[in-house]
């Protein structure tokens, strides 16, 4: 494992304590101002859910030397039976759509300079075929941003350790993105841990 993914201050602290030499990534739908400075002590990568959170906390994270990401919403649902957890469902506030990003950049042209990576998390106990569909949607909506990024996080929900999981499809997705855009690829294989 290259590191941990946390959802807030206390998980990030635990990740730093238990795996001190590994990367510590944090995503939170909304960071709290009263905790953010402490979070900077533990996190290496900080992923924001929205352009407004990026604008509010991104400069402090960048000044602290953190790698900064934005959770994107490719608006491509692959869910069946897990719709309640689907971040791509209509009305979802998880991740930033392309239209939201474009509107935010028009109002705040300094935002793109803060970003080092993009993060999507759209799967729930799914096979690599769903990842391939989602990745195609990510490229359709966000491909022009990827060459400027250092990394792309494919998120969690990959059922990698399930018998029959299409590892060749996963490998193909990773290699394709690395070759096209020159980015490091992250996965969050939660059930494998």
Cite the ranges covered by each PLM segment.
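Active-site-proximal beta-alpha core segment in soluble small-molecule metabolic enzymes
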Residues: 1-151, 173-176, 180-181
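Short acidic/glycine-rich loop or secondary-structure boundary segments that cap or lie
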Residues: 79, 162-163, 193
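Glycine-rich beta-strand-to-loop/alpha-helix junction loops that act as flexible
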Residues: 122-123, 151-161, 189-191
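Metal-dependent catalytic neighborhoods of phosphoester/phosphodiester hydrolases
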Residues: 163-169
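Charged (often Lys/Glu-rich) extended helix/loop segments that serve as interaction or gating elements
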Residues: 173, 184-193
């Amino acid at each position: 494992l290259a590191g941990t993914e946390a959802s807030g201050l206390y998980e990030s602290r635990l990740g730093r304590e238990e795996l001190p030499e590994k990367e510590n990534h944090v995503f939170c739908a909304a960071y709290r101002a009263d905790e953010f400075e402490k979070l900077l002590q533990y996190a290496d990568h900080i992923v924001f859910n929205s352009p407004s959170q990026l604008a509010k906390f991104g400069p402090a994270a960048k000044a602290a030397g953190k790698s900064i990401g934005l959770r994107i919403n490719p608006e491509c649902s692959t869910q069946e039976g897990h719709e309640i957890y689907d971040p791509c469902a209509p009305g979802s506030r998880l991740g930033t759509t392309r239209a939201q990003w474009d509107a935010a950049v028009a109002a705040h042209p300094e935002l793109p300079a803060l970003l080092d990576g993009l993060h999507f998390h759209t799967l729930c106990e799914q096979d690599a075929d769903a990842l391939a569909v989602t990745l195609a949607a990510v490229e359709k909506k966000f491909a022009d941003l990827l060459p400027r990024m250092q990394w792309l996080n494919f998120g969690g929900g990959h059922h990698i350790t399930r018998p029959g999981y299409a590892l060749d499809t996963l490998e193909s997705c990773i290699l394709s993105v690395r070759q096209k855009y020159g980015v490091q690829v992250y996965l969050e294989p939660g059930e494998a841990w």
